[in-house]
C-alpha cells in the first residue's frame, strides 16, 4: 500500500512542508523562531477569540467588559493574561527572527525577506489597534497620539486623521473599527505567513555557514520537529511564568484607569516592543521629520539586501561585521530604554545619538565593513 501522506492531496502538502522537507543538517537554535512565531500566532488567535466572546467595543462598557472577563468569566483572567503577554512573546520572537536573518544573510532570499517585512508591519499594526481595546488611559492617549501623527502628512493629513477616527476625536467609532481591524488582521497575518513559507520552500533554508547546503540535507521530521518541540517548551515556560507570576510586569499602570479625555497622563508611551521606534520618532524635533524617521526605522529593512557588499553571505566568519552587528543590537536596547524615559536631558541627546547611530550602522558602516573584509581576504598588494 502506498503511503497516504505521499499521495493524499492535502497530506501531500503537509508532508512536503513539515515531514519529508530536506533541511540543512547544521541549522542552529536561531532557526527555531519561525515555528515559535507560528505557535504564538495560534495562541493569540485562540485566546483572542475567547476574549472577543465577552468583550464589548463600546466606550461606556469596554473597560468594564475587560474587568468582567478577569473577574467573572471562567479562567478569563488566564485567557487575558496569556493574550497580553503572548503579544510580548510574539515580538520577542519576531525581533530575534529578524536579527537572525540579518546576522546570517537570510535577507538575500529577497521575496521571503520582503514578505517578512510586510508581516512585521502587519503584526505591529495589529498590536497597536489591540492595545486600544481595553480603553484604559494609556490605550486612549496612545491611540490619540499615534493616529495624530498622520496629521503631519501635507494637505490631506487632518482629513485622514478624522477619517480614521470616524469623528473629531478618538471615540466610540474609533474603538469599534479598531476592534474590527484587530479581529481580521491576525487571519491576514496567517495567510501572509503561508506565503512567507511558500517563498522559503522555493529556495530552502539558509544555514549558519552561509554556503549552499544541498550536499548535506536531512529530513525535517524527526530531527527538526523534536527541536521545534523543545523550543516550544521553553516558549511556554516563559509565557506561563509571565502570565501566572507577574502578568502586569510589562504593562503600564495608567491602563488600570478608565480612559479620560480630560486628563492626560504625564508620560504617554507605547508597549515595550514599540519603544525603540518611539525613541526614534521623538528624537527629531519636527512632526513630519519624526514620522518619516519612524517609518524609515522599519522600512530600512527592505533595503538591507541592496546594502550587502560582502563576498560571504553569513557573518559567521566576518569579525568586523560581527562587532558592528552587536553594536546595532546594543543600540536598539538603548533606544528601547530611551523610549520609556521622559523628554528631558540627558535622555534627549542620548536618543538623538542612538537614532543617528542606528541609521549610520545599517546604511554606511556595515556595507563598508563588508567591502573592507573582502579586501582583507583578497588584498591587492
From Swiss-Prot:
Cellular component annotations (GO), alphabetically ordered: mitochondrial inner membrane; respiratory chain complex III
Alphabetically ordered keywords of this record: Electron transport, Heme, Iron, Membrane, Metal-binding, Mitochondrion, Mitochondrion inner membrane, Respiratory chain, Transmembrane, Transmembrane helix, Transport, Ubiquinone
InterPro entries membership: Cyt_b/b6_C, Cyt_b/b6_C_sf, Cyt_b/b6_N, Cytb/b6-like_sf, Cytochrome_b, Cytochrome_b_C_euk/bac, Cytochrome_b_N_euk/bac, Di-haem_cyt_TM
Top-level division of the source organism's lineage: Eukaryota
Keyword Transcription tagged: no
A single MF term (Gene Ontology): metal ion binding
Residue intervals passing through the bilayer: 33-53, 77-98, 113-133, 178-198, 226-246, 288-308, 320-340, 347-367
Cofactor note: Binds 2 heme b groups non-covalently.
Location within or outside the cell: Mitochondrion inner membrane
Primary subcellular site in the record, as a coarse category: mitochondrion
Residues annotated for heme b b566 binding in this entry: 97, 196
Binding site for heme b b562: 83, 182
Membrane topology label: Multi-pass membrane protein
Known partners and oligomeric status: The cytochrome bc1 complex contains 11 subunits: 3 respiratory subunits (MT-CYB, CYC1 and UQCRFS1), 2 core proteins (UQCRC1 and UQCRC2) and 6 low-molecular weight proteins (UQCRH/QCR6, UQCRB/QCR7, UQCRQ/QCR8, UQCR10/QCR9, UQCR11/QCR10 and a cleavage product of UQCRFS1). This cytochrome bc1 complex then forms a dimer.
Protein purpose: Component of the ubiquinol-cytochrome c reductase complex (complex III or cytochrome b-c1 complex) that is part of the mitochondrial respiratory chain. The b-c1 complex mediates electron transfer from ubiquinol to cytochrome c. Contributes to the generation of a proton gradient across the mitochondrial membrane that is then used for ATP synthesis.
Note: Heme 1 (or BL or b562) is low-potential and absorbs at about 562 nm, and heme 2 (or BH or b566) is high-potential and absorbs at about 566 nm.
Protein name, entry field: Cytochrome b
Gene for this chain: MT-CYB
Amino acid at each position: 500500500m502506498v503511503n497516504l501522506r505521499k499521495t493524499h492531496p492535502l497530506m501531500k502538502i503537509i508532508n512536503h512542508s513539515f515531514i519529508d522537507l530536506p533541511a540543512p543538517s547544521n541549522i542552529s537554535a536561531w532557526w527555531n523562531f519561525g515555528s515559535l512565531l507560528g505557535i504564538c500566532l495560534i495562541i493569540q488567535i485562540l485566546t483572542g477569540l475567547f476574549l472577543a466572546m465577552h468583550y464589548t467595543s463600546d466606550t461606556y462598557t469596554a473597560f468594564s467588559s475587560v474587568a468582567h472577563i478577569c473577574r467573572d468569566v471562567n479562567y478569563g483572567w488566564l485567557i487575558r493574561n496569556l493574550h497580553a503577554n503572548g503579544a510580548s512573546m510574539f515580538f520577542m520572537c519576531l525581533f530575534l527572527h529578524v536579527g537572525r536573518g540579518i546576522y546570517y544573510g537570510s535577507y538575500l532570499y529577497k521575496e521571503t525577506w520582503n514578505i517578512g517585512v510586510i508581516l512585521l508591519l502587519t503584526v505591529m499594526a495589529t498590536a497597536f489597534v489591540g492595545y486600544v481595546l481595553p480603553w484604559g488611559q494609556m490605550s486612549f492617549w496612545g491611540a490619540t497620539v499615534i493616529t495624530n501623527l498622520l496629521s503631519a502628512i501635507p494637505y490631506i493629513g487632518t482629513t485622514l486623521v478624522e477619517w480614521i477616527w470616524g469623528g473629531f476625536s478618538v471615540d466610540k467609532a474609533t474603538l469599534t473599527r479598531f476592534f474590527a481591524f484587530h479581529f481580521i488582521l491576525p487571519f491576514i497575518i496567517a495567510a501572509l505567513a503561508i506565503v512567507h513559507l511558500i517563498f522559503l520552500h522555493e529556495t530552502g533554508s539558509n544555514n549558519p555557514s552561509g554556503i549552499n547546503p544541498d550536499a548535506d540535507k536531512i529530513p525535517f521530521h524527526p530531527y527538526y520537529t523534536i527541536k521545534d518541540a523543545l523550543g516550544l517548551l521553553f516558549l511556554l515556560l516563559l509565557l506561563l511564568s509571565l502570565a501566572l507570576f507577574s502578568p502586569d510586569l510589562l504593562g503600564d499602570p495608567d491602563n488600570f484607569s478608565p480612559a479620560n479625555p480630560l486628563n492626560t497622563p504625564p508620560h504617554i508611551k507605547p508597549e515595550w516592543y514599540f519603544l525603540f521606534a518611539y525613541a526614534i520618532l521623538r528624537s527629531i524635533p519636527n512632526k513630519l521629520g519624526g514620522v518619516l524617521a519612524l517609518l524609515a526605522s522599519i522600512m530600512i529593512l527592505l533595503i538591507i539586501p541592496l546594502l550587502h557588499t560582502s563576498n560571504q553571505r553569513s557573518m559567521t566568519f566576518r569579525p568586523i561585521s560581527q562587532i558592528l552587528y552587536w553594536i546595532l543590537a546594543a543600540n536598539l536596547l538603548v533606544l528601547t530604554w530611551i523610549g520609556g524615559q521622559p523628554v528631558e536631558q540627558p535622555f534627549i541627546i542620548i536618543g538623538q545619538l542612538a537614532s543617528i547611530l542606528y541609521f549610520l550602522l545599517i546604511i554606511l558602516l556595515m556595507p563598508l565593513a563588508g567591502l573592507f573584509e573582502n579586501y582583507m581576504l583578497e588584498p591587492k598588494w
